[in-house]
Amino acid sequence: GGVHGMERIGSQILLAWLENLLARCQWDEGLLHLLSKVRLVCIPLLNVGGLLKSTRSNPNGVDLMRNAPVEAQGFTAWPLGGQRLSPKLPWYRGQKNQLEIESQVLVRYVQEKLLGQPFSLAMDCHSGFGLRDRIWFPYASHRQAPPHLAEAVALREVFNNTYPNHSFYLMEPQSLNYSTHG
C-alpha cells in the first residue's frame, strides 16, 4: 500500500486488515492454525515521502508505480503508461536504468520473501482510476493473458459468491484498460 502518497486508502485498508487479524488472533484458533502454515508479508506504506508531501510521486517527483525494472511491450497510452521527460509531468518514471530507493527496497523484499516460494500471492492496494471501483489482476506491461489467469478468475468467483452485493467493483486484468511501464 501507499505506493502513491496521496492515495491513502490503500494504506488504511491494509492497517485495518492487520488490526483485525491481530484482534482475531486472541480467539480464532482456525486463523492461528492458518497463520502457522503460511508466511504473511505486508508493506502498508511504501512511499512515505509522498504521503508526507501529499503527492502521488516520491520527493524526487518519481511515480513509484512506473519506476520498476519492467518495460511495457507494445503501445502504452502516453503519458499514462509512464514518461521520462520531466518529473513536473504526471507518471514520471525516473531516469532510465535507475530505480528509486523505495523501488529498490521493494524489489529486494519481493525477491527475498516471495520468489522461490512454492506459492505466493501479491496484492497492491491503492485507489484512483476512472469512475468505477476496480480490482485489477496484475501484469499490465503487455496485453497477453497474465500468468495464473485461471487462478485469478477463480479468486474473483469466490469473492463474487462471498459478497454478492458488491456489484460496484469491476474485477479484470489491468491490461484490458491500458498497458504501463513499471
Residue ranges of predicted features:
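Structured catalytic-domain cores with a bias toward divalent-metal coordination
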Residues: 1-182
